[in-house]
Amino acid sequence: MKERLVDENLALTEQLNNVESEFGEIIGRSEAMNNVLKQVEMVAHSDSTVLILGETGTGKELIARAIHNLSGRNGRRMVKMNCAAMPAGLLESDLFGHERGAFTGASAQRIGRFELADKSSLFLDEVGDMPLELQPKLLRVLQEQEFERLGSNKLIQTDVRLIAATNRDLKQMVIDREFRSDLYYRLNVFPIHLPPLRERPDDIPLLVKAFTFKIARRMGRNIDSIPAETLRTLTRMEWPGNVRELENVIERAVLLTRGNVLQLSLPERDIVEAPRTPAVLPEEGEDEYQLIVRVLKESNGVVAGPKGAAQRLGLKRTTLLSRMKRLGINKDELV
């Protein structure tokens, strides 16, 4: 038993080291993540605007940091801004800066994020939460590479590479008139879709290993083994909170562990398993796109229900819809 644990953990460590050496904190060897990392490499050396799309907790900031670190701007620190973290008035001042006396309480000049990010990259997280009234100013600085501080008419030139991220459906927001179409097209130059953790189960053992050792080191614990059954249990879970949720679960496990073997303790209600074996298997030479299209046709375009495509594929309805969206499959065109 002990020798098997050692062998399994040595294999995980070797895979982990190979990944970490190329992309720092990004962990993943699945096909889904390999596709993401290829896109990161392709776009990093340009100055093109990047839009990172993905659910909460998928690691969008890590992707932004990787793009910056691989770019020619990596000699300067990447500047970060969360558009959902403050009200519109403060957000405008934080982005563009202000002059003394520009508004009540502006007792001194302030340099904004666009100015701080000159010759570097600016990461705008949760860009879908930017108020409509601020969006024209963001569009202008992207188009003209110039702006004014609040309370000033002086144009300031800036050389900034923008990386934006959101967990919201910007296309739908444009339709609903909650997001400007011209800004959307300006941001959507090079979109990168970050898959949720449930679509990359092969990466879970690597992530568990990385989080366990990182957290154990931080807490001064010595944990050098992770049982195979623990990895299987974690791999079967759905993870609605994605990588962030997994990291929190591992932190709890490290806290509760006594000894050098990770002890996983989960309340029963937390264990929501993903389907283990699909009811319909791919035919020889059939890829994921072809499999889903075939099953949708056989199901007459029905996704949910006992005879729906999701049930036949052994997937949750939301998971199948997410994959259909990623692969560009429209069920209405198949019936």
Task: Tell me the role of every PLM-derived stretch.
Residues E25, K38-G105, E115-P131, P196-P201, ...:
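Conserved post-Walker A coupling segment in P-loop NTPases
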Residues A106-R110, P136-I156, A165:
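Substrate-gripping "pore-loop 1 plus following alpha2 helix"
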Residues L12, V36, T58, M81, ...:
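Conserved RecA-like P-loop NTPase ATPase core
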